[in-house]
Amino acid sequence: NVNQIYISKGKNFLLFFDVGSPPRKEISSGYQAGPLSFEYFIDNYKIITNCGFGNKISKKAEFISRLTPAQTTLCLNDSSVVRFERNNLINSSFGTSIISSFKVFDFNTDENKSSLTVSAKHDAYKNSFNCVHKREIKIDKKNGNLMGTDNLISVNSNSFFINNYSIRFHLYPGINAVQTMD
């Protein structure tokens, strides 16, 4: 677990899983809002990726690449899990820092001879949408197959404020995908 990124390397796979809460505001200028996002390699080929950091393209691309929809994670109502500072004076001194936060918790691993399962939760949507996001990723060690589930857990069963959601898996450029009936 390096800098709150869980890393697991198997015979034919490599997994990076973001299980860290956001940094303090003072040191958050490079934070990308992708709680429970992950990157996955199989047979040394990167398959699933985040969008990267667009700082070599433009300031706008850099900002957009930090939002939740640019990460391989669940996104509710096309919103980002954190709000970013909009004050130009603060941004010119400290970079674009975050002004809201959340916690990642209940990180678990279960590994045996045939599979690896990792899971965690975050409460970034608790105040806005009354729910906690739980992600579980399971890797079959024999063939490298990756399976996962995302759950939204209501904090208060009386209200649930979600209009739409998306779960994005950004494929590495050059990777082709085919939809199956499974």
Q: Which residues does each PLM region occupy?
A:
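Short, intrinsically disordered, charge-balanced linker/junction segments flanking boundaries
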Residues: V178-D182
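Catalytic and substrate-binding regions of extracellular carbohydrate-active enzymes
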Residues: N1-I167, L171-I175
